[in-house]
Amino acid sequence: NMEMLDKFDVYPSTAETPSVLHYTSGTTGKPKGAQHVHYSIISQYITSKYSLDLKEQDIYWCTADPGWVTGTSYGIIGPWANGVTQCVMDAGFTAENWYSFIERHRVTVWYSAPTAIRALMKEGEAAIKKHDLSSLRYLASIGEPLNAEAVIWSEKVFGMKFHDTYWQTETGSMVVSNYPCMKVKPGSMGKPFPGMEVGLVDIKTHKYFDKKGVVGVIAVRPGWPAMFRAYWNNPDKYNEKFIDGWYLCGDRASIDEDGYFWFVGRDDDVIN
């Protein structure tokens, strides 16, 4: 009741007070705890608003488990900060379950993973035609590169493309994405989120370069609110991620003549 709320003591905190600890295995070594702070909500709010195109009247479904960084950042914090109604599904994955869920709750914005999207592709159009999915207006993906075939398929069966996004546990929010106002190039990661400086550094020297079509390591200038502040009890590993004023994502990509990023693979070429 309200009387209990009035007596509840809120722990004093600032924008830089630690708020979330997300564990990430990366590709090598033991899992590392990426520590984020309260200030992260600014990045998650603004990227949810402009990359996922969330509006107050939307019914939003992020299919990620809340124990995963996407399920926290974009399944809880970002959409809540935008005042958006969210749906949570507690059932196993089948095309029938998912399409029924979208139809029943009139989902308008759907954020999912490429693996799930490809599984839906295998189920075919017949599964889609059983349901009224006309409420959908915006589709986005995260978790791994979204292949061009999946983007083309989604436009055919849903009447709209999936917008791929790119970020990591350590970045805390989207770094590169296909946002609503830009043309989607199937298979591309998109472009850097406005206000973030994202580029490529040489694979061997880690020096920044600006050459179209040349593969390098994705790097981000530190300073965005959701950037992780530490690896829990592992300062040496944290410091290794920053070289010459850049945070190194550890992923390789190229940039085309229009500024679109194209994922190539992990820098260490190891599959976890």
Question: What residues fall within each predicted segment?
Answer:
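Gly/Ser/Thr-rich phosphate-binding loop
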Residues: A81-V84, V107-S112, M121-V184, F193, ...
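Short Gly/Pro-enriched turn/cap motifs at secondary-structure boundaries
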Residues: V10-S13, G187-F193, D210, K241-G245
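Conserved AMP-binding/adenylation subdomain of ANL enzymes
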Residues: I42-C62, P66-V109, A119-E123
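Conserved pre-ATP/AMP-binding loop-to-beta segment of ANL
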Residues: M2-Y23, K30, D53-I59, L136
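Short hydrophobic/charged patches on amphipathic alpha-helices used for structural packing
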Residues: V10, A95-Y99, I128-K130, N239
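Conserved S/T- and glycine-rich ATP-binding loop of Class I adenylate-forming
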Residues: P18, T24-T27, Y60, I102, ...
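Conserved ATP-binding/catalytic segment of the ANL
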Residues: D210, A219-N272
